[in-house]
Amino acid sequence: MKIEIKDLHFTYPGGVEALRGISLTIEPGEQVAMVGQNGSGKTTLVKHLNGLLQPTSGSVLIGDWDTKKVAVAKLAARVGYVFQNPDEQLFSSNVGIEVAFGPRNLGYSAEKTDALVKDALALTELSDKTGTNPYDLSPTWRKMVALASIISMDSDIVIFDEPTTGQDALSVARIAHVVAELKRRGKTVITITHDIDFCAENFERVVALSKGQVLLDGPANEVLGQAEVLAQTYVDPPQLTRLGQRLGLKETVRNQEEFLAALKK
């Protein structure tokens, strides 16, 4: 599902201009990380993708749908949004009901809903927790319930808002596994993140925002190697990227595998 953002401007009530002429194209199946300081426009931008916000001017197309002309409930069939705080998203009495709500609300058959729920629970390692109230689970597991409730809707585009915030190392690994599996399935995955190492290890394209505009946009290695430009939006390159630069490696590296390979050259 292609995303086309054309000259997008957005001004909040009170006159705060949050987005200033953003144009981006995201192809089906891309894995894109949005980075930048607080207030750079990341969350405002992605909330235009599922219709939670409407452009002041410009347009956002999700496939052939103009978000200004399509209801939020209908857009949910194409764009799934996992909130930063799962407690803002969860409301059902047990995990199974929570994860089934989305596909049922989209009008899927009972058979398809059951299959999607089973798959989402397995992918997020929640199969043994279907009868548990989400609020009896730890925050890390509630995050997985929130992920599962979006995955079960089988939308072509999945947005993660700060997925690793408040998560331990094991939970971050689970989330990375989910991202990798969604990529394998051909889904478009977009994340907003301050976790630059998670971004570097799991996303192929990075868009850096500053003051409501695109500062950098390109392959992760190219963007994350531009420390001086990233500093304008208070983003530091990953630790291994910085180490590689200090060692004088010819290539920009973003993970352990690339770092070790570059050392051998």
Residues covered by each model-derived region:
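A short, flexible loop at the N-terminus of ABC-type nucleotide-binding domains that lies
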Residues: 1-2, 9-21, 69-71
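The feature captures the beta-strand-to-loop junction immediately N-terminal to the Walker
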Residues: 35-37
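Helix-to-loop junction immediately C-terminal to a conserved catalytic motif
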Residues: 50
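Conserved ABC ATPase "signature" region
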Residues: 111-129
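Catalytic Walker B motif of ABC-type/P-loop ATPase nucleotide-binding domains
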Residues: 158-161
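H-loop/switch region of ABC-family ATPase nucleotide-binding domains
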Residues: 193-194
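Conserved ABC ATPase "signature" C-loop
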Residues: 211-212
